[in-house]
Each structure stands twice: as structure tokens, then as C-alpha cells.
Amino acid sequence: PQAFYKCSSLNGTISVPVGVFSIPSYTFAATSISSIEFNGAVTEIGVNAFMECSSLTSITLPDTVTTIAPGAFSNCIQLECFVFPENPQFTKISKETFKGCTKLEEVLIPSSVTEIAESAFQGCTNLKRVVLSNNLNTIGSMAFKDASLMEGVYIPASVSSIPENNQIFKGMANNSVIYLGSSDLISLMLQSKANPTSTSNGFDSEKTSLAVTDGGTFAADTKFESGKLATPIKEGSIFDGWYKNEGCTGTAVTTSTAGETYYAKWIELKSDAISMEYGSTQ
């Protein structure tokens, strides 16, 4: 551990050779490296392994990685792009993993992830877009606190609880939208009023609206924009607009207003059985 900790003269690209399976705690913390090449089958990134690497701009982890320990990439202030491993054994984004990564703009959580721990993305002040895993169950306290440019986040129906007093969404952008995979999540979002307009989980009705996708998700390239309702997708159905009531009656809308709740309308595709006899034109 701490092999190159605070070696500020260590810069450029670091190549991790074949045969290395773990990056121990603090190994490259507070160095000046700008990129990393993984040539082997690394499975674990240790505690604070790349913390405060102020020149590190992008990282693509190999699909062999199963564990990213707490604080691994915290305060990497130039980190703009991070690609998670596609590994069914990678199930948790640990505490403070990306805390203080002020240039990180978007996060696509892989389907294997079931838990995002506390403060995982806290203070990511340039984070604009987050798409959570459809298998996510747990979101820790302050996970996205002070992500002040975050214009949209999708919370899948698989999330079973949003604990009170955790300030998960505190500090989102004006006219931002929180997309909910199920209407069951509405009550969780509105629980425990901290004041007349905001709740203890950080949802502020003066700044943010809710949009229920009713099982719909979003394509990987979907852009969430303040004041605009993004278009969801749902297998076996066609999206038929956003509405201001759960019955999806009246006129569809495309823009959002803070404090409102919107509902997605779907038209189910039906494949009618067609039988034709040989030689028939009917």
C-alpha cells in the first residue's frame, strides 16, 4: 500500500501490467498521473487508490473488476469520464468513491449494481445526468448531495426504500426532473417534510418535478434537460406522452414545472395471430 502516495512527479500514463490483480490502498493517491492502462485482469481497486489524482481525466476499468473500495477516485477534480466494469459480480459503488469529482458530467450505473453507498457522488458539482441500474435496491445518504447541475435522475422501480434524513437529492439544478420507475416511489420522495417545500431526502418542490415512467426506462444516450420531459422506452409498448394526472387524460405535455408530478402513458403492442393457407391471398 501507498507505493507512490504523494509522488507528485509521477505523471503521464500508468500501465498496469499482466499479473497484477489488485491496486492496493493509496497506491497512486495524490500523484500527477493523467491516464491508466489496464493490461491484465485487475479485480480490486483499493481504498483511496487514486484519491486526489488532480490530472486524471478519464478511466475505463476492465470488466474483470469486482470491487471498488471507498474513496478510490475521490477528489479527482479533472475526472470527466468514467466507464464502469460490466461484471455481474460488481454490485456496489462504495462510500465516497467519486466524492468531490467536480468535472464528472454523467453517470451510467451498470445493471449489476444493487447498492450506491453514502456520499458516493457527493459534491460532483458538474454532474448533469444519472441513470441508475434497474436492479438497484439501496441508495445511501447524501449519495448525490450538492450535485448542483444535475438536471435529471432516473430511479428504477426496484428501489425499495429512500431513507429519511439522508439528503440524497439536496442541491439539484433548477427545473430538474426526478424520474420514478413506479408510482409507489412518490410517497417515498415526499416523506418527512423538512420545510413547506422540501423533504429530508433533499427533494425540493420549488426546484424539481417528478415524472413516473410506469416501468419505462431510458436509452443510454438519453439526455436529461432542465424543464424538459425526456422520452422513456418500454419493451412491448409505445410511449404516448406525459400527462399531469395518473389517468393520463387531457393534453400531453413536453415541458416540466417544478412541483408538478407527471405520468407516462403507454400503448401496448399486440401481435395478433395471423393464419394463412397456402395459395391464399387473404
What would you call each of these model-derived segments?
Residues 52, 75, 100, 123, ...:
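Sterically constrained small-residue positions within well-ordered secondary structures
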Residues 83, 180-182, 198-282:
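Secondary-structure capping and domain/repeat boundary segments
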Residues 165-168, 188-204:
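Short, aromatic/basic amphipathic alpha-helical patches
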Residues 8-22, 31-44, 54-67, 77-92, ...:
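Structural signature of tandem-repeat unit edges
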